[in-house]
A protein has these predicted regions:
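Acidic, metal/ion-coordinating pockets
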Residues: 1-117
């Protein structure tokens, strides 16, 4: 749910988000399946942050807007893991912003030794 720093707006997630008539569009084909299970856990590939401080030496820094956390709720996603190679693309600030966005939506998260329940 985001873009890398050099990606054009054209054909980007941001463009799809801006043009979507319904925010539920992104998970519409799996929402019913996710809603019927006990818990849906997904990988959150990049942080949800407005930070512009990219990690040095990283070829592709991925991030999404913190508002995208709401899309997870609309998709009946209850938990995310973001213990992956892009978690620190925007430093610790990016991780903190992600945690805040997830907590505001009531989404459980896990990364490294941190679990938000």
């Amino acid at each position: 749910m985001g873009n890398h720093q050099e990606q054009d707006y054209s054909a980007s997630f941001r463009q799809a988000y801006d043009q979507a008539e319904d925010e539920g569009y992104f998970f519409e084909n799996v929402r019913d399946i996710f809603a019927a299970d006990d818990m849906t856990i997904v990988n959150l590939e990049g942080p949800l942050t407005t930070s512009e401080q990219m990690r040095e030496g990283q070829t592709y820094c991925i991030k999404g807007d913190p508002a995208y956390a709401h899309l997870l709720t609309l998709g009946s996603i209850e938990a995310v893991s973001f213990a992956n190679n892009h978690r620190l693309d925007y430093g610790e600030q990016g991780s903190r912003d992600t945690v805040v966005a997830l907590e505001q939506e009531g989404i459980i998260y896990a990364y490294d030794k941190n679990v938000g329940i």
